[in-house]
């Protein structure tokens, strides 16, 4: 399964959670005000570690997100939008559970609205369940680059230019494409770029990766859903035509025709605090309406 549920519960009236982390956007006053409100409300109840970037803006001592697990942090409160969540997850090799406060727009990865934040955090401190979502390790010429939570996009390095490439699954040719690019998405990322490119929405309980060509030249190049434990290889075919690989829309790397890109399911899933019993299908419909 690519989505599993775990529980952390309190004993009696005692808080189950003793140490939490906070990491936020730093460029919006309302986001920083929310962080200040959380600190004012809960600093006397639990030990709070604030990310270095957020702490610098607030003028307090900070802790890198990468070190929060070593400090005994049990969950990270991410204040911002989906991009903030993805950046925070990417900083952790083995991600801590994330509780997302939605200060963005659409927000598929952030379930808590600002007006509900304090009450929700208070409930979570007495115990919570979390869901594990699969991620994908990205390798370039055998060297690991990053781990993607949402998607990996391979696109032309020059705007409005198509690229020609092959996609192999476990050494079997899936397709040879001429297109603007291709998106490889996890079930979590199937509602992001992959969906905009015409790919299917995948329930997180489905253990799969979706392959979505972006503006393909031939009509037979269609989206594919493949097993999550597959090894995917991407090879550029045209000499002197470079491409760019973008990971979760956060980091990008230039690739050349002689380069080999491989994608494999990661051993370290993302973990999201569960705060609602709303079913997946209803939740997606609500977000998209």
Swiss-Prot record:
Keywords recorded for this protein, A-Z: ATP-binding, Cytoplasm, Kinase, NAD, NADP, Nucleotide-binding, Transferase
Listed GO biological process terms: NAD metabolic process; NADP biosynthetic process
Catalysed reactions, semicolon-separated: NAD(+) + ATP = ADP + NADP(+) + H(+)
Assigned EC number: 2.7.1.23
Catalytic residues of the enzyme: 82
Disulphides: none
InterPro entries: ATP-NAD_kinase_N, ATP-NAD_kinase_PpnK-typ_C, NAD/diacylglycerol_kinase_sf, NADK
UniProt subcellular location: Cytoplasm
Pfam families the record matches: NAD_kinase, NAD_kinase_C
GO molecular function, one term: NAD+ kinase activity
Cofactor: a divalent metal cation
Any single GO CC term annotated in Swiss-Prot or TrEMBL for this entry: cytoplasm
Positions bound to NAD(+): 82-83, 87, 150-151, 161, 178, 180, 191-196, 215, 250
Functional description taken from the UniProt entry: Involved in the regulation of the intracellular balance of NAD and NADP, and is a key enzyme in the biosynthesis of NADP. Catalyzes specifically the phosphorylation on 2'-hydroxyl of the adenosine moiety of NAD to yield NADP.
Similarity comment text for this entry: Belongs to the NAD kinase family.
Protein name: NAD kinase
């Amino acid at each position: 399964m690519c989505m599993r549920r775990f529980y952390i519960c309190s004993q009696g009236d005692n808080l189950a959670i003793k140490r939490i982390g906070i990491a936020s956007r730093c460029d919006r006053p309302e986001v920083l005000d929310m962080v200040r409100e959380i600190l004012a409300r809960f600093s006397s109840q639990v030990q709070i570690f604030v990310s270095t970037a957020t702490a610098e803006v607030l003028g307090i001592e900070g802790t890198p997100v990468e070190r929060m697990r070593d400090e005994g942090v049990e969950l990270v409160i991410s204040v911002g939008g989906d991009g903030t969540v993805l950046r925070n997850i990417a900083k952790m090799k083995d991600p801590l559970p994330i509780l997302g406060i939605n200060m963005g727009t659409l927000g598929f990865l952030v379930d808590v609205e600002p007006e509900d934040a304090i009450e929700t955090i208070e409930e979570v401190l007495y115990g919570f369940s979390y869901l594990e979502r699969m991620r994908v390790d990205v390798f370039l010429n055998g060297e690991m680059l990053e781990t993607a939570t949402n998607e990996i996009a391979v696109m032309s390095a020059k705007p409005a230019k198509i690229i020609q490439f092959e996609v192999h699954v476990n050494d079997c040719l899936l397709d040879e494409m001429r297109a603007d690019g291709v998106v490889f998405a996890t079930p979590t990322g199937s509602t992001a770029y992959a969906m905009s490119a015409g790919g299917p929405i995948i329930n997180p309980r489905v253990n799969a990766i979706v392959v979505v060509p972006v503006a393909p030249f031939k009509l037979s190049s269609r989206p594919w859903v493949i097993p999550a434990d597959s090894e995917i290889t991407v090879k550029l075919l045209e000499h002197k035509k470079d491409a760019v690989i973008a990971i979760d829309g956060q980091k990008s790397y230039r690739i050349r025709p002689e380069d080999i890109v491989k994608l494999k399911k990661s051993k370290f899933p993302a973990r999201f605090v569960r705060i609602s019993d709303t079913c997946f299908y209803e939740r997606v419909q609500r977000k998209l309406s």
